[in-house]
Amino acid sequence: MQLEAISITDHEYLTRLPSNDEIEIINGVEVSVSWEELEESNAYAGLHLLLYFIKKDSPVEIFLEEIRRLKEIRNLEIIDNLQNEGLDIDKSELNNFKTRVPGRPHIASILKNKGYVNSINEAFIKYLGNGKIGDSRSHQPDIKKIIELSKESKSLVFLAHPHTLMSNEKFSKSENWVNETFFSHIQDLASFGINGLESSYSSYNKSITGQISNIAKKLNLLECGGSDYHGDIKPNINLGFGYENTPIKVPYEFLEIMKEKHAQL
């Protein structure tokens, strides 16, 4: 088995890398979004969309600049809220990270390094998750808007790590969330115009991947896969590895179908 293709989907920031003779590179980006219909329940952990085949200066690429601006405002508000709670954290500490667009995971890392929490996950549970003082959904674009912009831009849009629709657990290995409510939410997303689901994911076993794959087929949606590698921010995920540290395998057929779909747009 060898790596034939890859897409590096940074949050809210698109980097265009050229393909070469050995590895095919697909441009892409990951975007955090809100979904108003689910806001009241506070049940989901945070929704992310994966966008692929983004044309230069397309509507969705232009809108990414606005998303980054809102994210910077949100980061400062979160830190202000944490300071008001008595936590010793300064805005300048975000500059210590080698990233163009710091996010909540970086704030979580600061909290962990200062001993306020024992893990990144605990930081989200106590301070940064939905309904907490670091809740950031008010600064996130609506999911329907991003899907619509993606359609206008002739890009493909997928739901990343689908368990976040149903679970507050950061890495859910339980299968309880793959149920009728989950299927209903995916039906809604399909009606909005989403193209597919991330069925292969680092914390999914074969059973969960199979169930999501079956839902995708039932609703005529495409499939993609990824490790969700974030470096030190997610130390339990190794680059290219998935469930129980086995190599994550995403069929090249997924990309072939994606390219066929994209050519029809």
Q: What feature does the model see in each segment?
A:
Residues I23-E24, S174-N176, F241-Y243:
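Glycine-rich, phosphate-binding/catalytic loops in enzymes
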Residues V29, S34-E72, K112-K132, L239-H262:
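Active-site gating loops and adjacent loop-to-helix segments of metal-dependent hydrolytic enzymes
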Residues M1-G103, F192, E198-L219, E223-K234:
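A metal-dependent hydrolase metal-coordination microenvironment
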Residues I73-L222:
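Domain-core and long-helix interface of multi-subunit machines
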Residues L265:
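Flexible, D/E/H-enriched segments
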Residues S167-E169, I233-N236:
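Short acidic/His/Gly/Ser-rich catalytic and metal-binding motifs that mark active-site loops
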